[in-house]
């Protein structure tokens, strides 16, 4: 696997610009939340087998609509494709394998603004690595980022320079994966961006860069 990594000069520019952006993100309320509830708890995924069995049963019991009347996808996802996906999810997909991959990584939960936030935190072996927070999109989860962790934290193993290394923080957005579900409105991109700043400072990163796609990228546009 190869990864295109920024040059050291580009990393300096990214670090400088992101540090300025991060400092503008921290309101008084966010600082108070960080001071009053900053515990970081280890986390492991352990989905009960009964829940997996029930999910497979419900997938297998899907009541399918009539087949589309065209040979393309102009009427939506073709019935045959959805039926094949459902068959795979119900019979072939190995959740435990995915669970093991997640549990092989350092996972944590911390409370920010009253909401539990799940995240993966992988530090590079290179102490001068650049901290980066990476956010998944919609629909999506932290699983999207699993393949980039090793190339970005250990670039020398992929033919790049150790100076291109990153410390990675990969959170689950509120309401996604193993993060808590908001009970009220207000967790918009700007709020999530402020929460990510609190998270990074809680982990000891006063300066950092950020990356995301789709909805995950919109959080970082909030600083203009």
Regions found by a protein language model. Name each.
Residues 31-38, 75-78, 104, 111:
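Alpha-helical solenoid repeat scaffolds of the TPR/TPR-like class and their adjacent stem/linker regions
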Residues 60-107:
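An N-terminal hydrophobic leader/cap segment in hydrolases
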Residues 89-93, 98-224:
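Catalytic cores of eukaryotic secretory-pathway lumenal/extracellular enzymes that build
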């Amino acid at each position: 696997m190869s990864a295109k990594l920024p040059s050291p000069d580009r990393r300096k520019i990214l670090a400088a610009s992101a540090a300025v952006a991060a400092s503008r993100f921290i309101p008084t309320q966010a600082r108070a939340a960080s001071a009053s509830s900053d515990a970081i708890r280890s986390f492991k995924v352990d989905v009960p087998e009964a829940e997996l069995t029930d999910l497979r049963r419900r997938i297998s019991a899907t009541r399918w609509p009539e087949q589309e009347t065209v040979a393309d996808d102009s009427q939506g996802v073709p019935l045959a494709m959805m039926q094949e996906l459902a068959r795979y999810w119900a019979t072939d997909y190995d959740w435990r394998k995915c669970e093991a991959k997640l549990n092989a990584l350092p996972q944590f939960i911390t409370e920010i603004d009253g909401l539990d936030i799940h995240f993966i935190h992988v530090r590079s072996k290179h102490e001068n690595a650049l901290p980066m927070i990476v956010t998944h999109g919609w629909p999506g989860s932290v699983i999207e980022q699993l393949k980039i962790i090793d190339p970005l934290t250990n670039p020398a193993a992929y033919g790049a320079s150790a100076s291109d290394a990153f410390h990675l923080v990969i959170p689950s957005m509120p309401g996604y994966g193993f993060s808590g579900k908001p009970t009220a409105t207000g967790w918009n991109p700007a709020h999530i961006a402020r929460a990510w700043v609190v998270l990074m400072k809680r982990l000891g990163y006063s300066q950092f860069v950020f990356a995301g796609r789709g909805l995950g990228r919109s959080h970082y546009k909030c600083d203009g």
